[in-house]
Amino acid sequence: MIYNFDELIDRKNTSCVKYDALKKYFGYEDLQPLWVADMDFKTPDVIINAMKEKAEAGLFGYPIATEKTYNLVKSWMKKRHNWDIDTSWINFVNGVVPAYSATVEAFSEEGDEIIVQTPVYFPLFKHIKSNNRKLVKNPLIEENGYYRMDLEDLKSKISSKTKIFVLCSPHNPVGRVWDKEELEELAKICIENNILMISDEIHADIVFKKFIPLASISEEIANNTLTLNSPGKTFNTAGLNCAYAICKNENLMNRFKNVVEKRGISSVNVFGFVALEAAYEYSEDWLEELLVYLKNNILFTKNYLEKNNSKIDLIEPESTYLLWLSFKNTISDYNKVKQKLLEESKVALNEGSSFGLEGKGYFRLNCALPKESLEKALCKIVTKF
């Protein structure tokens, strides 16, 4: 490998949520953080150097996305996901979550229903409630460690008040990369019922099988989908607040833009565009090596649990660096599992129940860290369970 993902970097006291907010969120400071979805790997040097060059110029006025910026997003979608988009379909925003919240306002009214597939990344249902919409759950089905959509349940949940379906693709936290057939059937149901699809595809680059952007499947689906994405997860630049929406349907995009402007979320950090351009133009080789390292970490975790006859079950992911671990066969009392992880294993994981009640009994572990640190964490967990 050209890149050193084994490098141990001390992130404490660097004003990062993952390390410096442990006391606030978990009540303890002496925990190994395996929760927030960012990586313990350095951002590629080419991105760091581009930002240094920008910093050394000494000018930090209001930035703008140039023709190059738009074209790099377009070319990235083509070469990574075989998706042909037009630059006119792209609108930059300062984050996927703020943009998602804007879609809720733009395409529904107070009291309308929005469907999500739980367990799922919690802001996806949090912003439904904060916008005074009604959350409707279409829980995923888990069978023998594999999750699938329950489309019959989805059909039964649709009413005249249903306006939006939210797709998490790839899925956080269960790690599914949805197959084309699943997406087609899902889209068919939504289109037949005049339900707009919002597809959160922020983890699209961190995949271990072919990923299909929802809107790439057909023109009909593209005209009924607004996609949200960012280089933040891929290149560990989440703190630079640079994301974008992609939508072929001009009417939908204009409605989205109106709310984006109203909310003041169109201004991207001055370094955000710099990082995006360096990432999408020069950092693909880094990403390829990252994927190999992450896959090895996943396999290491699987083998470690098996070798130690652990009662913890890994839902092996098809995407993301987030491992969905079932503790259902360890201790029946969920609160005792949580307490034991904090007080005895001394690790900070995301509680499964925070992704919806369907996640109870599970915990999410971030494996985007050096193998040495991962092994240390697994040892602390397995010895107590």
Language model segments and positions:
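Conserved core of the PLP fold type I
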Residues: 60-188, 205-216, 220
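PLP-dependent enzyme catalytic core of the Aspartate aminotransferase-like
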Residues: 155-156, 331, 340-349, 355-385
